[in-house]
């Protein structure tokens, strides 16, 4: 009820897509309570998604939403969303928010700020400016940006039924996940669970992604 799905998305993408639902790390594994073991909680979530691509090789895309809270600094939020749109914008308009979030910072100011030609240069600006505000770039935003250089960003809408959080739609092509992430979260599962390749699925085949090297400056 927040996003409009185009016919092209419904026909060409959705049948081969898994939605990334909300995840919650239980208290005993949160870093503030668990110390070092909590640092691996987010990695465990990625490991689970990597396993899905092995046992369900027909899945080609992950669709989900990045959530930001109303308490986050407004100018910082605007900078992050502008940056995402500049470097990951969905030009085909496969998915669009029904009521797009309107940024409070002027487009001219943001365009002047993020004036570089590469992801790496603009990312340095973003990270510096966010820190000046006393904040950090949300971990999941960094995580998604470092997962694939071809991620698509579909715009942002407010979820009035879930605490007015601001949700940004994204799409990641499984076979375009960066090589180091593929090895870390997918190849390791294949090596430790060889029998998983024999599990039944809707289509035959084993996930064999092409190697995708980082675009210049994709953050890690």
State the predicted function of each range.
Residues 155-162:
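Short proline/glycine-enriched turn/loop segments at secondary-structure junctions
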Residues 1-23, 148, 152, 166-220:
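Non-catalytic substrate-recognition and accessory regions of acyl/acetyltransferase enzymes
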Residues 73-75, 163-168:
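Short, solvent-exposed polar/charged micro-motifs at secondary-structure junctions
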